[in-house]
Amino acid sequence: MRLATDPAGSSSGLPQPRRVAVLSVHTSPLAQPGTGDAGGMNVYVLQTSLELARRGVEVEIFTRATSSADQPIVSVAPGVVVRNVVAGPFEGLDKNDLPTQLCAFTAGVLRAEATHEPGYYDILHSHYWLSGQVGWLAADRWAVPLVHTAHTLAAVKNASLAAGDTPEPPMRAIGEQQVVDEADRLIVNTEHEAQQLVSLHHADPGRIDVVHPGVDLATFTPGDRAAARAALGLDPAARIVAFVGRIQPLKAPDVLLRAAALLPDVHVVIAGGPSGSGMATPDNLVHLAGELGIAERVTFLPPQSRDHLVRVYRAADIVAVPSHNESFGLVAVEAQACGTPVVAAAVGGLPVAVRDGVSGALVHSHEPDAWATTLGEVFAADPSTFGRAAVDHAATFSWAHTVDALLTGYGRAIADHRADNTLQVAARRSGRRFSMRRGVRA
């Protein structure tokens, strides 16, 4: 495994796709991040698709329709369309029930592809294990390589469950193993995630590409803090720590509230909507803030559009990411791009997203007193001293860089797939059996 942007992994000389089919079964790239199942993955799928289209690559994204008002085909931008596939009831279907609808979703994907001429897609990229299950079948049917991004793994999540959170079911871990075995290439966010795939799922390191996610550097920029606070109705003189994301135990907004209770002059802004179980609704957090005696120091905002999210980042002195696990942490990079330092849990990909002691600080605990101590230290050092370094660090994560690396991974997958086809022909001529994903057999 290696960074797909390493000189040895340059896309120069590798075949490049003309058209890519992208699968995102459980959440639409057009959904508002910060609520339900919509989060960083939605942003990743949409932004990489838009950047691919800028390079002349056509992208079709398949997702499950969740409303009768969803149009079958939505044109997002030149070269990017979203296909809303009808699979099961539009509403009221929990993500854990979606495996029952994978046959219906797969049928919808295959029928859509059948409207094109044979060989229309050059590659298929699935996101999350549910999509991987569909992608495994579709890739075999279309005779194209399957590239898969897990985003999260059941074994990792279950090893870092928050109090009140629901463990991932065994069928997910089984499904993830199947997809790891069947995919031609695996895209991961960090080297740490690559090591997890190898240790937990015995993935072949040679089939793994490390591709860091990006940030929209034209949208997320430093700006006037006073103006941002005025727009949000926040005290211009307050010391503000912001939390942005889905309100669910995994994201641990309760840890931030408990830490704030130990910092008498800190105001907390929480921007996000409900997701998951346990301490998973704004109402529950409102109740917790009341119990802690800090209700008057906490402001709750609904999920924000990108333009409004920029104001939240700019308004904050610090953005907190106390998650129990993050495969990367796009919120951390977006905040730093706005010149706001980040205090984050030292888990998953966050040590890559945040430069400890330079663009923010990492906390090696989820205990409120440890968080209060680190937040206090950053305030004492003056958060603005981290601002320039935060912007510089975020500048290394652009969607252009991400897609450069992604195209390298795609090129490797296509080249290997073509080589397999050559071996398949040779094997047939010699009377030997051949599996596209297992090689020549006696």
From Swiss-Prot:
Annotated Mg(2+) binding sites: 313-314, 316, 340
Domain of life the protein comes from: Bacteria
Xref: InterPro entries: Glyco_trans_1, Glyco_trans_4-like_N, Mycothiol_biosynthesis_MshA
Reactions catalysed according to its record: 1D-myo-inositol 3-phosphate + UDP-N-acetyl-alpha-D-glucosamine = 1D-myo-inositol 2-acetamido-2-deoxy-alpha-D-glucopyranoside 3-phosphate + UDP + H(+)
Binding site for UDP-N-acetyl-alpha-D-glucosamine: 32-33, 40, 246, 251, 304, 326, 334
Keywords from the named record: Glycosyltransferase, Magnesium, Metal-binding, Transferase
Any GO BP: mycothiol biosynthetic process
One example GO MF annotation: D-inositol-3-phosphate glycosyltransferase activity
EC number: 2.4.1.250
Keyword Magnesium tagged: yes
NADP keyword on record: no
Enzyme category, top tier: transferase
Chain residues that bind 1D-myo-inositol 3-phosphate: 26, 37-42, 95, 128, 152, 172
Stated family: Belongs to the glycosyltransferase group 1 family. MshA subfamily.
Quaternary structure, from the entry: Homodimer.
Function: Catalyzes the transfer of a N-acetyl-glucosamine moiety to 1D-myo-inositol 3-phosphate to produce 1D-myo-inositol 2-acetamido-2-deoxy-glucopyranoside 3-phosphate in the mycothiol biosynthesis pathway.
Name of protein: D-inositol 3-phosphate glycosyltransferase
Organism: Mycolicibacterium gilvum (strain PYR-GCK) (Mycobacterium gilvum (strain PYR-GCK))
